[in-house]
Regions:
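P-loop NTPase motor domains
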Residues: 1-81, 164-185, 190, 194-195, ...
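Conserved ATP-driven motor cores of ASCE-family P-loop NTPases powering translocation/secretion/packaging/pilus
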Residues: 73-178
């Protein structure tokens, strides 16, 4: 871990969940690399790594459950350590780190991305509140016995995206929450439609026999 943290190399740690899983080993090795990177950053004048360390913790709750992650999440960025934590749902994060722990991570993250497919009402209501409200114009007309009409114009506040909208977010869309900016609705780009699709297919064919490769549309 000490040697790797000081290099520009790439390390892939792969495991499955369930009995006999190497997940504890993956978590321990990742934590050791993080500790080494923190120590290296402490030896620099600015307290930051000269070359950022980027960790992409896919399925973090299943195969890379580092207990201390919530408590350290907020200051890693200042050391040049960039962490992306990928979870299937907010509830999965609660199961792994507890309600307080996952809230720490959610609050400390400079960029948060919601990809849909979640039906947790409490979480979705929080997300809806972060997106905010907009004003909806209302026009009403009344008719009196004297055959006179009166018209009034007002407005009311309405959620931009309510819980039902977020639960039904279409495939290929995502919401991005970044520090200092309003939430943004984006279109995602599947890897098989991107510029590196051929290289990825070749790698999967060579190193992942039996994998069903997506067919371009």
């Amino acid at each position: 871990p000490e040697r790797f943290a000081a290099t520009t190399d790439t390390l892939y740690l792969v495991s499955q969940e369930g009995p006999g899983s190497a997940a504890p080993l993956v978590a321990a090795l990742t934590a050791a690399i993080l500790d080494s990177a923190v120590a290296d950053a402490g030896h620099t004048a600015g307290g930051r790594l000269p070359v950022p360390l980027v960790l992409v913790l896919d399925e973090a709750a299943n195969v890379c459950r580092i207990r201390s992650l919530p408590d350290k999440y907020s200051y890693y960025g200042g050391m040049g350590i960039v962490i992306t934590t990928v979870l299937q749902s907010y509830a999965q994060g609660v199961q792994a780190w507890g309600e307080a722990g996952i809230r720490k991570m959610w609050s400390a993250a400079n960029v948060k991305i919601y990809l849909g497919g979640v039906s947790e009402r409490g979480f979705l209501d929080d997300v809806s509140a972060l997106i905010g409200d907009h004003r909806v114009q209302e026009i009403s007309q009344t008719h009196s016995q004297g055959a006179q009409w009166s018209r009034s114009i007002g407005s009311r506040s309405e959620r931009i995206l309510d819980v039902a909208d977020l639960a039904a977010l279409p495939l290929g869309r995502a919401l991005v929450f970044s520090s200092g900016n309003r939430p943004t609705l984006i279109r995602t780009l599947p890897w098989w439609e991107g510029p590196h699709a051929d290289a990825i297919r070749a790698s999967m064919a060579a190193h992942g026999p039996g994998i069903d490769l997506p067919t371009p549309r």
